[in-house]
Amino acid sequence: MTDGVWWFFLFWAPAYFSDQYGYESDSPMAIALIFTLYAIVTILSIGGGYLPTYFVDKKGMNPYIGRMRAMLIFACFPLLGLFAQPMGAFSPWWPAIIIGLLGAGHQAWSANLYSTIGDMFPKSTIATITGIGAMAGGIGSFLINKGSGLLFTYAEGQGSAFSFMGFDGKPAGYMIVFCICALAYLVGWIIMKALVPKYKPIIVDLTL
């Protein structure tokens, strides 16, 4: 679910700045915006490994509980995506900064998500579980990117007849996808918490 958000911004960010502001991907302004976006992601995502360590070492939490609490905090970062399109009316730098913060939240979330596998599953199964998760993430990424493209094409064709939260046409399509991306992490966290409400190591019988 959440991998698709990351790949959406990887794939569509240049097109977004081109569609909304007319900056071609190879223009100096577009390059500056994309550079800023990923600089924010790179610098801030480093803190993704520190927060759960703080909860475990300083607060004495169980590793799973500390990691889940950290992931809940990281899941709130993407909520900033709700403001990317509205703030973009003032300057293209706002979406670049907001998407960068969202991306940093994703990287921190993703690092801890994969670490929960090591917390719960035996070492002999970690590679398999990680591979299955990566495959599911790839499928989700394909679906959100393909679906977004279809939505943008449809919204652009409808023009002012297609509206959402004060935006018409293709901008309305972007606003819809930004809303989905913003909420995906909290939904993912709730699903994880519902499936695994308490820490319980999973034992696999390899004698069968």
Question: Model-predicted segments: where are they?
Answer:
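A late C-terminal transmembrane helix in Major Facilitator Superfamily
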Residues: 118-157
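Helix-to-loop junctions at the C-terminal end of transmembrane segments
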Residues: 45-63, 152-153
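Multi-pass alpha-helical transporter architecture, strongest
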Residues: 79-88, 174-208
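Loop-to-transmembrane helix entry
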Residues: 22-40, 66-67, 93-97, 128, ...
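A membrane-interface helix-boundary motif in multi-pass transporters
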Residues: 63-69, 150-183
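Transmembrane alpha-helical cores of Major Facilitator Superfamily
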Residues: 35-39, 100, 131-139
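Extracytoplasmic gate region of multi-pass secondary transporters
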Residues: 1-49, 106-110, 114, 141-149
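C-terminal transmembrane helical hairpin of 12-TM major facilitator-type secondary transporters
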Residues: 64-113
